[in-house]
Amino acid sequence: VREVLVLLSGVALSLAMGHPWACFHGDPQHSGRSSNVVGAPLTRVEARGLGGKVSGSPVVRQDGFVLVGARDVRLYCLGPALDTLLWVADLTPYGSSIYYSAPALDDSNNVYITTNRRLVKLSSNGVVLWSWPANNSLSISHSPVIGQDGKVYFACYSDSLYALTPEGTLAWAYPLGRAANSAPVVGLDGNILVATTRGSAPWPLFCIEPDGDLHWVHNLDGDAEFSSPAVGPDGAVYIGANRYLYAVRSDGTLKWRDSLLARVQSCPAVANESTLYVVAGAGLYCVDTDSGVRWRRSIGGSNYCSPAVDAEGNIYVGTASGTSSRFWCIAPDSTVRDSHLIGSDIWSSPAISGRGIYFGTMADTMYLFQGPGSGAVECRVPAGPSGMRLLPNPTRGVVRIAPSGRYSARVFDAGGVLVARTLDADRLDLSGLRRGIYMVAVPGAQPCKVVLR
């Protein structure tokens, strides 16, 4: 029997917090989902100029500092309010640009990022620890991801998926047979998934085991150009390929395929076990994970920005429409809650933390917006080594504990008083409690939040 400890917001936590947004699209599964709430209306807090265009995405580490790469081949570490610069790392010896790469943070605050030529590892204070390969021989555009085994994975135009140890040694390279122009993702089982582009049909979606062996391959009818996969709570893989959106089961079999009105050039956001959001062309789509498209909201532009979802289900996304580019907050029912004219293309995908929401623009600028829910304790819902999650989150009462098993759970009120207890069960019933944000601590994982509506 495993034990899950549920604490109400405001109760002191002794365990270290995890990174609120640890890598591209938040976590190694690319869920795009946060356990923090931003809400609407949005207020612009800061717009900070950098030394180059920001087409990659920011990440937020556990102390609130924001890291982002720019096309001037520098990695910036900014204060939580973007008003201070902790350090900047010059990566020009390792490439000539940072295209769409977001940093990836490990548990020690070390940083991995790809330039257009190499994978670079830096310490928490911006010192380069190593780079790979030793020469600028690769062509890389997208983000690395850290696996459950600590290895770092990235794909490139040279037709291979690479795995490196934390010490910078090549563990293996898997030949994909064609180019990869998107970021790999880590499945709940630890396998690595990567999509392909260029050439002619079919375009393989690969599932590679952590030791470099092929687990399965599923052929897609469209190419995944700028389209990275995301993994759902049940292990299903969601991937846009040209004008199709695919759901592929964790065993490699097709669950469904839906046709959209435009090419998908971003990563889906998995709001919960039944809902995901994806951008295709000028539209934001809400998709039922069983039955397909629920609604489409026009947001304008031809977009590369991957949407992000907060703990209340609000969706945040930017557009690339030149001087008409906007940043949107959209409710789960497709209602526009707020939008702000930014005036420059937003290719960067937003990152959510307790401080607010961050994104960059092609006008060399990083933005911080806050909403009514900003300022909460920094925390995110980690999958952990076993893929453990509380589902659905947000919830209206009953929360299922995944993966399936028998758990002992205790629930405390704001004063730390035990108000409920569950023994040897696979779910928690919070329906007798008032609405609010609860802190969840799982032995062996970081504390996280569950929102009771």
Task: Please annotate each region the language model reported.
Residues V6-S14:
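Bacterial N-terminal signal peptides
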Residues V1-V4, L452-R453:
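Positively charged n-region of N-terminal signal peptides that target proteins for export
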Residues E3, D63, D149, N219, ...:
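Positively charged, low-complexity intrinsically disordered regions
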Residues M17-S374:
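Secretory-pathway ectodomains
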Residues R380-R453:
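C-terminal outer-membrane/trafficking sorting elements
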Residues S374-R380:
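Extracellular low-complexity Ser/Thr/Asn/Gly-rich intrinsically disordered segments
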